[in-house]
Regions:
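Membrane-embedded beta-barrel scaffold of Gram-negative outer-membrane proteins
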Residues: 284, 288, 294-300, 304-312, ...
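Gram-negative outer-membrane beta-barrel transporters
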Residues: 409, 417, 521, 526-531, ...
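C-terminal beta-signal and adjacent terminal beta-strands/loops
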Residues: 477, 569, 619-628, 648-712
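Extracytoplasmic beta-strand/coil segments of soluble accessory domains associated
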Residues: 37, 65, 69-110, 114
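Face-selective signature of the C-terminal outer-membrane beta-barrel domain
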Residues: 229-236, 275-433, 460-462, 520-526
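Short acidic/polar hinge/loop motifs at secondary-structure boundaries
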Residues: 110-138, 157, 500, 539
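Short strand-turn segments of transmembrane beta-barrel domains in outer membranes
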Residues: 142, 153, 157-188, 199, ...
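Transmembrane beta-barrel wall of Gram-negative outer-membrane proteins
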Residues: 174-203, 208-247, 271-290, 294, ...
Length: 712
């Protein structure tokens, strides 16, 4: 069960009740999308940053979303205060509740975005398996990687057996709220062959009642590498159980749910849960066909199973009192999703009219089959069965030319055929609400094929080794996923959704500068992004719609300064103005996007290698609540947190102690406002929103985490 679909169901309920990359002045072109990492130094003209394995190891943050939040342009929404990032959402350039559908996630350069609202599960990647993370901001990534890269692309590059740092390693963690984790990795190399395996196991009681987590992850890769031929085979699997505490009202409601934000650790849904099991196989090879010409072929199959159960906690007869012992299953979700792909491409380096030139061109094909049963309880005949197939076939090319030793230009394009076939099988006999629908609740069949296109134009000019400017323009698109086409449903939601969501499109332009003075580095850029048919969920009616035109205007600046050999500081600031351009909400803010956010950090090698101190502070400004397109409700308050980590190494042993949220801030960064009730059989005229009423997901205060381990 995805975080997005969970938020949809909770939203429907509340609607009823209430590293900076330096430039080099040289003719050689930056590598783009070749071999193991398809991003490397990024596309010309884009704002790109890299997080290394050393950055991850030294950071007090112990999950990917919090590590990523220490980069400009990125904000995070937490639902469960989970130490490993389970159910967290990473938002790149201001997309709020559906951020996960507007950021394209890659692992080793391959798409891993699932065809549902869970998107990418950050908790499924062991941190000890990561070699680096590459972030490319803006629309340009769609040209190379396909639909969904509206806010940008995040590429997680995993260690290989021959990677630096990929040694045999074991480590253990213990922390607040019964958090325990074990990690292990092993690597070996023999001639052209190498193998690496990484895994971890997590158990946590969680900050809130019914927020327990059990997670298991493993990935392994076999590689073969010679100068003219390389190949790999990888397998990854993960298994998760997650309790699902809903949001808490901001006031006590006699006769309603018993707990409010006055007791933030409590849960009004102590029985709800979600499970996930997934396995992924990938294989591929790269071969040098002739000098400067390389063929790269990848293929993969991913299969994911998800189950979730939601309960009705109110008695079915007067006085309709809240009960846990008498709670009955209200909604059960059993989903199977299979995605297969093949992506052949050519990387050609040559001279074009005497100028160094690199051309990357290829085809990618993805086929996803989504089947979801929705009975009221396990073992019963489904009320709805959703069967959706999506196929995409893309053709793309990206050409990069060194016009001069100090100037590069890139131009690329993609055309992509998108086909969707969707069916809903409805059983009125098994639907307790069957008699209340004004029309047939079965979603009409939907079959569609369309062509979409993406483009990128980028330019970079280096005035010297110390100063460069860059700019780009791009077009991108994203398709509605299965959960967005299905909607939320649930009791008292009598609007029948449609599978027919329009494709979201976007144009953006960006310009910036880079400064590299050795000890001091800085990157700053401004951008404008204009979108049409942005896909969004409305809890008041329980379905997804295409919004009126929207836009983002932003400024991002990141800096790094090496004070001396032992001490370095970093910081960044982000401004995003995300608004509606047209329609009844023209000029209003997009919910769940803070205009201002930032981070600052200090790393001090107190005793080099033996003792290191890292201090990180993160700040996000106030933001509109989910479901508050009208901008009438209170704001989610601004907040800042400080994390501290002290760690060291001796011989082959290492240790660390982290204190997170040092000043014990009690806050939330996700809340959903009352949106009223749409017209229906129980409320023919509908009900307006209740101003000041909202549900929030409170987060933990001060926590600690201890680590010890060894390499061998």
């Amino acid at each position: 069960m995805g975080r997005g679909h969970t938020a949809k169901l909770l939203g429907a309920a509340v609607a009823l009740t209430a590293s900076i990359s330096g430039s080099q002045a040289q003719v050689a072109l930056p590598p783009i999308d070749v071999s193991w990492t398809r991003l490397n130094s990024g596309m010309v003209g884009t704002s790109t940053s890299i997080i290394t394995s050393q950055d991850i190891e030294s950071s007090p943050a112990q999950n990917l979303p919090d590590i990523l939040s220490q980069q400009v342009g990125i904000q995070v929404q937490h639902l469960l205060s989970s130490t490993n990032g389970s159910r967290d959402t990473v938002d790149l350039r201001g997309f709020g509740v559906f951020a996960q559908s507007n950021v394209l996630m890659l692992v080793n350069g391959r798409r891993v975005q699932d065809f549902d609202l869970q998107g990418f599960d950050f908790s499924s990647i062991p941190l000890n398996s990561i070699e680096r993370i590459e972030i490319t901001r803006g629309n340009s990534g769609t040209t190379l990687y396909g639909d969904g890269a509206i806010g940008g692309v995040i590429n997680i590059v995993l260690k290989k057996g021959s990677s630096p740092g990929a040694t045999n390693r074991v480590e253990a963690f213990g922390g607040s709220y019964q958090y325990w984790e074990g990690r292990a990795s092993a690597a070996a190399t023999s001639g052209p062959w190498s193998v690496g395996a990484f895994g971890n196991a997590i158990s946590s009681g969680g900050y809130r009642v019914n927020s327990a987590l059990r997670q298991r992850n493993i990935n392994a890769t076999l590689n073969y590498a010679t100068p003219n031929l390389g190949a790999y085979f990888s397998v990854a699997g993960d298994r998760q159980f997650q309790g699902l505490p809903a949001g808490l009202n901001n006031f006590n409601n006699p006769g309603g749910f018993p707990f409010s934000l006055e007791t933030p650790w409590q849960s009004n849904t102590p029985l709800d849960w979600g499970k996930k099991q997934a396995i992924n196989f990938a294989t591929g090879f790269n071969a040098t066909l002739s000098p400067g010409v390389e063929l790269i072929v990848d293929g993969s199959v991913r299969r994911k199973f998800q189950q979730a159960q939601f309960y009705n906690y109110f008695e079915s007869a007067p006085p309709f009192a809240y009960t846990v012992g008498g709670a009955t299953s209200m909604n059960y979700v059993d989903t199977v999703m299979t995605t297969s792909s093949v992506t052949p491409r050519l990387d050609v380096s040559h001279q074009l009219f005497g100028l160094p030139n690199r051309l990357l061109t290829g085809i990618d094909f993805y086929n996803t089959q989504y089947n979801s049963d929705r009975p009221t309880a396990p073992g019963l005949v489904p009320v709805h069965n959703y069967d959706i197939q999506q196929r995409t076939l893309g053709f793309y090319a990206m050409n990069t030319t060194a016009l001069r030793p100090d100037t590069d230009i890139s131009i690329g394009g993609r055309i992509q055929k998108n086909s969707v076939n969707a069916r809903d099988s409805y059983s009125a006999f098994n639907d307790p609400n069957a008699g209340f629908y004004p029309n047939n609740p079965e979603i009409p069949p939907f079959d569609q094929s369309e062509w979409q296109w993406a483009a990128h134009l980028g330019l970079e000019h280096r005035f010297s080794n110390a100063f460069a400017v860059f700019g780009r323009a791009a077009r991108a698109f994203r398709l509605g996923n299965a959960d967005e086409r299905v909607g939320a449903g649930g009791p008292f939601i009598f609007i029948v959704p449609t599978f027919d969501l329009k494709t979201q499109t976007s144009w953006d332009v960006e310009g910036g500068l880079r400064v590299n003075l050795g000890q001091f580095r800085l990157e700053s850029s401004v951008y404008l992004m204009r979108l049409n048919n942005e896909i969004h969920f409305l809890p008041a009616i329980g379905v997804d719609i295409n919004l009126d035109p929207t836009q983002r205007v932003g400024w991002e600046t990141a800096a790094f300064y090496q004070i001396n050999n032992a001490m370095r500081v970093r910081g960044g600031v982000t401004y995003i103005n995300a608004t509606f351009r047209e329609g009844p909400f023209a000029g209003n803010d997009i919910p769940l996007v803070s205009q201002w956010s930032g981070y600052a950090g200090l790393t001090w090698d107190v005793v080099p290698k033996w003792l290191t101190l890292d201090v990180t502070s993160r700040l996000f400004g106030s933001r509109r609540m989910d479901n508050d397109q009208a901008n009438l409700q209170p704001l989610i308050p601004a907040q800042a947190t400080v994390d501290v980590k002290l760690g060291g190494k001796y011989d082959r042993f290492f240790w660390s102690a982290a204190l997170l949220n040092v000043f014990d801030a009690h806050y939330y960064d996700y809340a959903i406002a009352s949106g009223g009730i749409a017209a229906g059989p129980f409320f023919p005229a509908g009900l307006p929103p209740t101003i000041g009423l909202f549900n929030a997901f409170p987060l933990a205060g001060r926590t600690f985490l201890l680590q010890a381990g060894a390499t061998f």
